[in-house]
């Protein structure tokens, strides 16, 4: 017991927490000399590596001077907030990682607030101090002010600070120390993080905080033993959060060391282990001693704030590019996702249509991107916010939005957001001619704003947002200004007709792209939809051309990635997703039927 420390790593996206965990792993001697350590070893999913973000909370364990340190890497995005809260219940200490230049970001605030409310005393790690524009002292002051604003206790305000450059593998307790290795950080963890409370002699109590799935073993629950001890093959009682009970045996008990998972025989109070043996396990369930059952408090997960409809692809080009195209395949895959992804919900809404709710656009687009890579073909509707009724009042989710932008663009941003029902809360000048703007805005107002924002700030602005609360409905929000250019023919697009269409707006397609009636091929420069023919070819004459009418110059099309396309579409459009293409189309393909439906 004395020789265990359980800590979580909290940081904003891209402040280097996964890199720091790499450094701790390699310097603690957990990897033997022979093992080659990948970079960002904790981000195991392809998308996580590509985007450099952590989506699922991971755990690993290292040994340092006979002490076992269990480290849980938490996601930094508020969209994955469901993951974060559960992790905080499992640990006794937190490393709060802050970028020495950027300071505290809004998504970190979300987690810090939770950690402080659980009474955890954080260790502040100021990372990336090797950046030329680093201002570690200012950042420490910012953290202090943030803690005060969030009502931290005196003990929490007296936090230890470690300065580090995780990439280069060194840490120091004061800025004048020698840059050697991460030892000062290990020492700080041992000194300031309490060892787990709880006793080996009490009856067994353990709580599951995240799920995993293994094709061979079935459902695996990763849990912390709060009291007592547990053996492999022991009979235990599973107490679910709704009060029901189930008897069973622990068929597998798995411990963590470095990145490896090894089967173990026993686990004691304070350990973090994985167990198998129950198919009905859920997050927040307790595993207790059948002779003396004492369940732990179930966990409260944040409610989803946004939903989209996933449906079977029914366009004219359906089934040509994907491996899995049927409703049953899609249903099985979505339900499998729900087994391990707790912050999301999925309901069947009739034949081949599923409503998936989550904590934000990012979470939903990550799911769609994963499905797409696995060879699924499907369509997605525009994201909608979830509206709740509280005491007879319609309420919608509001977000806290923080924008860092060059000063020249702040006027345009404030005007844009005003139309989207945002309320400005603060405006502070930062260094290098940047301004930080803070708003409270309905989540609906943020859908589709990111691409406008990048245009307004010429790509130099940074925006981050996190969930605030549900508030009374705020009326209608301005949506996309421009109409769509819609194909009125089936076939392959030709350069000749695209050349004539491009004066009308911005194209999304290249020549030789397959198109069908009702497919959106571009954005109109005006606010109405326009039906166009993209497959017309030039009539040949037996006159000799003068050369001037031969030169067809096409502007490169705007490439639509998943997030951008989901933000762009309106209520009457859907996004068709296949492993090879993304196509935007109207829900009603036939132009005459569409006109009738509008009336």
Curated annotation (Swiss-Prot):
GO terms for cellular component: cytosol; ribonucleoprotein complex. It comes from the Bacteria. GTP binds at residues 14-19, 127-130. GO terms for molecular function: GTP binding; GTPase activity; ribosome binding; rRNA binding; tRNA binding. GO terms for biological process: ribosomal large subunit assembly. Keywords: Cytoplasm, GTP-binding, Hydrolase, Nucleotide-binding, Ribosome biogenesis, RNA-binding, rRNA-binding, tRNA-binding. Its main location: cytoplasm. Residues 2-197 form the tr-type G domain. The keyword Mitochondrion does not apply. This is Large ribosomal subunit assembly factor BipA. It comes from Helicobacter pylori (strain ATCC 700392 / 26695). The lineage of its organism: Bacteria, Pseudomonadati, Campylobacterota, Epsilonproteobacteria, Campylobacterales. The gene is bipA.
